[in-house]
Amino acid sequence: MRVIIAGGGTGGHIYPALAIAEGIKRRHPDADLLYVGTSRGLETEIVPRTGLPFHAIPAAGLKRGLSPTNLAAVLRAGRGLGASLSLMRRFRPQVVVGTGGYVCGPVVLAAALRGIKTLIHEQNALPGLTNRMLSRYASRTAVTFVEAAGHFPARARIILTGLPVRPEILNTRREQARRHLGIPDHAFVLLSFGGSRGARSLNQAMIPVVQAFREHPGVRLFHATGTAGYDEFAPLLKGTGSTAKAPGNIVVAPYFHEIAALLGAADLVICRSGASTIAELTALGLPSILVPYPFATGNHQEYNARALSERGAAVLILDRELTGQGLLAAVAALWNDPRKLAAMRQASKALGKPRALDSILDIIEKLAGKGTR
């Protein structure tokens, strides 16, 4: 099987692409894969480290309105389409997969023009502009959220697959995770994080939560500040009875390397609402308090969060409305209402798609004429 996978710009596009590549290799060890990105995105650092062959083409995103920047982007897109057409001729893929980012534009379009089967995958509840445009030409359009379907043209051939979740998270079990972390079965475990770089607003709002639950024998609280927020957060704990190292029931760190175990052990999670995070929460059936990143493209994180909150799987707090006392009240309300928490857990689990990767691989195999396992 010969497959080109394109996706770039951010980790949200790159990691799903890598998960798909790994899945193809597991099913078809002799498959020829080629990852296509740009020379400017994170993919230039991430992909080569995986051992996947990497090829860069010219590509750039368009902004609204007329500007010299847009003119340059159009010219670069034209060069990217030419490079992609040439690449299709040389590599001769059976299927081309796009996971988002403007690099997918010329790559998927070139494949469609050459009559090559294509699959695009949309991670968010509000699709990006590139995927909305490409869905007119793609053989199939896979979506993570059912809400995304209404934003695509009527002619798009949409399949609800979900978003691939890392095996170490899918395979985690509550009892094993708690045993590994030394957490008693009866403890209420609260996990909060704002992503690898953290979230200042979330860090600030967590102070009253730390104050309220410090040294509480029935609670274990884990808060990741992000690398940029740790030094700022640590002094804020002074006078709270806690420190950056924290008392026994509270752990504050820039980043948790054992996030899979922590998710497995958690009763409630406070976090942003990126697509990958949502996929992990729902795969494990975790209740959550979601605070969408307000500057995400098209405000897509709020759309993601609403997809859960409107089905009873999460509590939504907008970043502009986030306060320490408000967050504490939301946590306390759920902590004191096990029945509500159990209902949220069930609703979250119902939204999960733990077989997302297999569903996507099945589509690729069908498009390639290989059939399924």
From Swiss-Prot:
The species this protein was found in: Desulforudis audaxviator (strain MP104C)
Protein's membrane topology: Peripheral membrane protein
Protein's name according to its UniProt entry: UDP-N-acetylglucosamine--N-acetylmuramyl-(pentapeptide) pyrophosphoryl-undecaprenol N-acetylglucosamine transferase
Single GO MF descriptor: undecaprenyldiphospho-muramoylpentapeptide beta-N-acetylglucosaminyltransferase activity
Principal location class: membrane
Listed CDD domains: GT28_MurG (cd03785)
Stretches that traverse the bilayer: none
Family: Belongs to the glycosyltransferase 28 family. MurG subfamily.
Taxonomic superkingdom: Bacteria
This enzyme's EC code(s): 2.4.1.227
